[in-house]
């Protein structure tokens, strides 16, 4: 998750003019009206900081090392390997497989895979990598 707006933080509520009579809120007798307005503004600023902290915490939940992000990267890597295997299949049917395709498949298999928290996903990823390694070994034996 990315924060895309850098606009200022506004106060949470609209300020209303207080009646001239007795106010029911807390006030210090020694504080004049100007410093009272300044303290009200500082409280509103603190509220804004709290919301920024909440946004940063939310952003950290979807960070690079988060389980959801690791899972997405693992699935993306598996999709890439499956796409290359599809190209290999088509090239075998056509009878013309290039060294570039074999090299891409080899590099895709050698990439370090991140562990995920999902055992079923890990099993599928292992099967995809095993299939890719077997196909690569067969093609290299045929070519060499």
From Swiss-Prot:
User: Which intervals of the chain are annotated as region Disordered?
Assistant: 1-28
Keywords assigned by UniProt, alphabetized: Bacterial flagellum biogenesis, Cell membrane, Membrane
Among the entry's GO cellular component annotations, what is one?
plasma membrane
**Which Pfam family is one of those matched by this entry?**
FliX
What GO terms in the biological process aspect are recorded for it? bacterial-type flagellum organization
Domain of life of the organism in this record? Bacteria
- Major localization listed first in the record, in broad terms: membrane
UniProt feature, compositional bias: Low complexity: 1-15
Name of this chain's protein? Flagellar assembly protein FliX
User: Native species of this protein?
Assistant: Caulobacter vibrioides (strain ATCC 19089 / CIP 103742 / CB 15) (Caulobacter crescentus)
Which gene underlies this protein?
fliX
